[in-house]
Amino acid sequence: MQLTRRSLAVAALALAALPAAAQTPIKFQLDWRFEGPAALFLASDAKGYYKAAGLNVTIDAGNGSGGTVQRVASGTYDMGFADLAALMEFHANNPDAPNKPVAVMMVYNNTPAAVLALKKSGIAKPADLSGKKLGAPVFDAGRRGFPIFAKANNVQNVTWTSMDPPLRETMLARGEVDAITGFSFTSLLNLEARNVKAQDVVILPYS
């Protein structure tokens, strides 16, 4: 999902042709590190599409969707790439914010946010999460959206353990938490890097 504080954002994403005058500066923040989903924006920059459209785009890595939304709202960045749950949370908690970001384009057909657990934990369906210990960084989009997932699946009495992003999958692999939230493709690859086979992982997608 793309965020913006000005109508120019639509033109930036659509790569609409602008007059070849002075380059318009655009500061853009990703939701996370330079991973596969960022290719949409990085490849466009590398191929000169933004420049051809009259835009001078600076793309920075992020540290979570929540932070990206807040930085766009504050004016630190003109645009950003963030999960819809983080945007909804910002609107709910800041109804009087003067510069609330708005969504102008959806990148994913469905949110990649999910709960991941090891099969040996006995967790096989959302209801099995009741009473379990979940782990995620406080700014994780999956964690921010978990209350909606929990309500829809009647999950109760969950406790949270917070950690830095590099420790999330490590703590799951060690059994220090029962499950984690995160983007499924990122967490699955991180678990495989920690010698956890894909067939030993249970993924409970949000949608």
How would you describe each model-predicted region?
Residues 17-19:
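N-terminal signal peptide c-region/cleavage motif recognized by signal peptidases
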Residues 118-133:
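Flexible hinge/capping segments at coil-to-helix
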Residues 37, 61-65, 81-93, 140, ...:
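Beta->alpha turn/N-cap motifs
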Residues 25, 34-60, 90-93, 144-149:
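Short, polar/charged alpha-helical segment
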Residues 23-27, 49-62, 76-78, 100, ...:
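A local structural motif
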Residues 85-86, 167-171, 175-207:
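Pocket-lining segment of extracytoplasmic ligand-binding domains
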